[in-house]
């Protein structure tokens, strides 16, 4: 660790921030030509449950910063609208609209099906298998009863794919509640990966520690054919001062516009407009109980952030698909009497301005795609850290 900390002190901004400057990265309007990079090598990637491509984007940026090119051998998602956004941003990727269970078996011990055999022949020497299985079944933001959701079984696809492709590294991202699933799906997946020869580590991290301007805890699992990867050591190496809402979106205030869907605020109901006005007239950030709807005045609602106003000088609360509505969380703009725009939510999710959401044609699609996305800074940090360890010979 001391060697890593010395390296951190010597080249701090280059290491911990994308392109050495996270804010410059977020405000970049021109997409890098990842496909034309003059590279010293390439990295092969399979991204299951890829969504709009937050994990892929972070890996491309990490690889590019180290002079490497990424070949996306396979990207799969069941959400066609999210996948259209992915394809628009990563045209060279082999992206497939499909339920992963239509491609992979969920039982790691069953014989390979025809599609798995074909993929095994075409994808070899894989570097990274990554994925964030749908988390609705065990999200900390949902009721306990939803931990029974059948989607939890999709975790096992990650172990199945690891057995088929034999990647050097497997990275799984999800909410912390996944670890407490009553069926032990997370721990069982970790054990399956161990059984097929991987060293497995997992930790819960808060993304504001690595510069994402929101309070967003994630459970990270890394399985490695090489030495055990110390996740906390990587996070410590890339740790930054928490980034605030002001840092992320202040420059977008002048884009409050009716011209583009990304910068178009939602229209609140008359009641919610009154609540927003009350927050600003009284210069407060939490709506008093008597100003809330009757159903939220009772004692069974513990989320005080609902109907709240964001603080300029703090990270935002977790961005979800409900960011357009104040009744879904603390999503009222700190300085303007409205909720967040899609552009602002994307910034808080650490998506740069060059990333196109043009294929999301409706407000609902935008909210779902942005709210469900994985902030690219997470995969940037994890993969950049792993690649540097490889370059130093610490992952063998």
What residue ranges belong to the model's regions?
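A short, structural micro-pattern
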Residues: 70, 213-215, 243, 313, ...
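A structural signal for well-ordered alpha-helical segments within the folded catalytic domains
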Residues: 53, 80, 156, 183-187, ...
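Core alpha/beta nucleotide-donor-binding catalytic domains of modification enzymes
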Residues: 21, 25, 31-50, 54-165, ...
């Amino acid at each position: 660790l001391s060697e890593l900390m010395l390296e951190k002190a010597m080249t701090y901004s280059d290491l911990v921030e994308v392109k050495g400057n996270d804010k410059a990265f977020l405000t970049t309007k021109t997409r890098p030509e990842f496909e034309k990079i003059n590279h010293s090598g390439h990295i092969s990637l399979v991204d299951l449950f890829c969504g709009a491509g937050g994990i892929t984007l972070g890996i491309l940026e990490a690889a590019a910063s180290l002079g490497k090119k990424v070949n996306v051998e396979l990207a799969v998602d069941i959400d066609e609208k999210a996948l259209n956004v992915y394809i628009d941003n990563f045209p060279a990727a082999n992206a497939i609209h499909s339920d992963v269970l239509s491609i992979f078996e969920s039982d790691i011990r069953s014989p390979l099906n025809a599609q798995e055999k074909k993929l095994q022949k075409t994808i070899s020497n894989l570097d990274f298998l990554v994925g964030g299985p749908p988390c609705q079944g065990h999200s900390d933001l949902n009721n306990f009863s939803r931990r029974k959701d059948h989607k939890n079984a999709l975790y096992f696809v990650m172990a199945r794919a690891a057995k088929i492709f034999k990647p050097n590294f497997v990275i799984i991202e999800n909410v912390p509640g996944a670890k407490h699933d009553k069926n032990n799906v997370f721990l069982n997946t970790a054990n399956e990966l161990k059984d097929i020869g991987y060293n497995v580590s997992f930790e819960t991290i808060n993304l504001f520690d690595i510069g994402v301007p929101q309070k967003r805890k994630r459970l990270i699992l890394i399985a490695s054919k090489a030495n055990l990867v110390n996740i906390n050591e990587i996070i410590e190496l890339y740790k930054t001062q928490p980034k605030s809402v002001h840092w992320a979106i202040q420059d977008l205030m002048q884009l409050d516009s009716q011209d583009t869907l990304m910068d178009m605020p939602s229209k609140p109901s008359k009641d919610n407009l009154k609540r927003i006005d009350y927050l600003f007239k009284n210069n407060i950030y939490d709506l008093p109980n008597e100003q809330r709807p009757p159903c939220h005045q009772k004692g069974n609602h513990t989320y005080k952030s609902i109907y709240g106003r964001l603080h300029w000088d703090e990270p935002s609360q977790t961005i979800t698909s409900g960011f357009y509505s104040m009744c879904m969380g603390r999503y009222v703009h700190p300085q303007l009497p409205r909720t967040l725009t899609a552009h602002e939510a994307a910034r808080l999710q650490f998506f740069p301005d060059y990333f196109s959401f043009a294929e999301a044609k409706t407000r609902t699609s935008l909210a779902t795609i942005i709210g469900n996305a994985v902030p690219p800074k997470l995969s940037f940090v994890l993969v950049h850290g792993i690649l540097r360890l490889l370059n130093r010979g610490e992952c063998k």
